Amino acid sequence: MEVSTSYCTPAVNFKYGSFQDSDVSMREDDLFRMGSYNSQGYYADGTHLDGSIGEEDETSSGSNDQHMDFEEDDFDMESSMTEDLVDEDEEEEDEEDNDEWTNQKRTDNQNSVAYYAAMEMLRIRFPFQSIAIRISDFCCLQEKDLLNDTMIDFYLNHIVEHVLPDSNGSNVTVLPSIFWHNLSLRQHAFDSEDEKMMSDEQKMDLKFGDLHDFVADFDLQDFDYIVVPVNEWEHWSLAVICHPFTAQARTVIFDSQLTADLNNLQNMATLIESFMKYSYEKRTGNAMPFPLPCILPQRMPQQTNNFDCGIFIAEFARRFLLSPPKDLDNFDFAREYPDFSTATKRTEMQRVVLSLSTNRARWRPLVELLNGYSTAAPHRAL
């Protein structure tokens, strides 16, 4: 595969779940109001209210309307007080029953799968991200499952903060996976009619203004490498911006499921370059001095299934950041990293999470359980 440095291809129109008024047809008389009831004392679903008037009560009520006159001497105060005390006792019993029901419901919730899935295993603060890993996130590390954004963000930051040696001399940062999601949505942030009414500066502000604020806490010029995890259509790939705003500036794209059509990857690099241009001009008031060509490494390892893309980009990032090629324009992956393997990557990532957890012994049975399911059927993409 030849190194691709040309990316002047027309942009591809991506559609991320458009919504139209015609997609929903709802009549007012179809609306169901939970807990509403009518004048006959029935809920909307036909359930009779406990405190509603029954047939016998309605009869007696009607007769009482005709005999409202009574003698004051006939009023039995003792009987009335006794009835009031009985009513109070019944109310207290109802409250106790409600408390028991509430406690039982709370216990049931704590025993539910959702309760355990939301339990937090690790909370860690990286320089620009605070990440909480829950059991549901950790379960993505079992075989035949796709990694979710939490595990991708965690491991990429772990590489930068805990794996790269201080003597490396490179300044590296990781943008969270939500960055690419927001960036990709901005590429068609306005329709053709709006575009005609806007200046070039207004168009760029509309597309990238919010994202520029997103990275306002640090200067992109301070970094030698900017790592950008990319998720498109439930597939992970990786973009690494190398030496931005210098003559050596390149965007290296890593993908473990290449197709004959590389336009999508080239468009990815083009969108990243557009944002970098915008960010540089906003910070300095000048045009970006150097272009940001796209590099696609030759002989890149490819996955043989539909669920290991996240595992591959995790190892791509580790290998590349530990030992970046000196000549990016002739980047041959197989030559640079001949012993590349992802065979034990999932268990390695499990060990990393446990090593940083303050209660690691508590989670070891979970690890054994997950690894015991290594032959299970593939799970739905997260």
UniProtKB/Swiss-Prot annotation:
Encoding gene, per UniProt annotation: ulp-4
Show the GO cellular component annotation of the record: centrosome; cytoplasm; mitochondrial matrix; nucleus
Descriptive protein name? Ubiquitin-like protease 4
Keyword annotations for this protein, in alphabetical order, are:
Cytoplasm, Cytoskeleton, Hydrolase, Mitochondrion, Nucleus, Protease, Thiol protease, Ubl conjugation pathway
EC number(s) from the headed UniProt entry: 3.4.22.-
| Annotated Acidic residues bias | 84-100
Q: What does this protein do?
A: Protease required for deconjugation of smo-1 conjugates from target proteins which is necessary for cell cycle progression. Required for respiration and the maintenance of normal mitochondrial homeostasis. In response to mitochondrial stress, required for the removal of smo-1 conjugates from the transcription factor dve-1, which promotes the translocation of dve-1 from the cytosol to the nucleus to initiate the mitochondrial unfolded protein response.
Organism equals Caenorhabditis elegans
Show the InterPro entries listed in the entry.
Papain-like_cys_pep_sf, Peptidase_C48_C
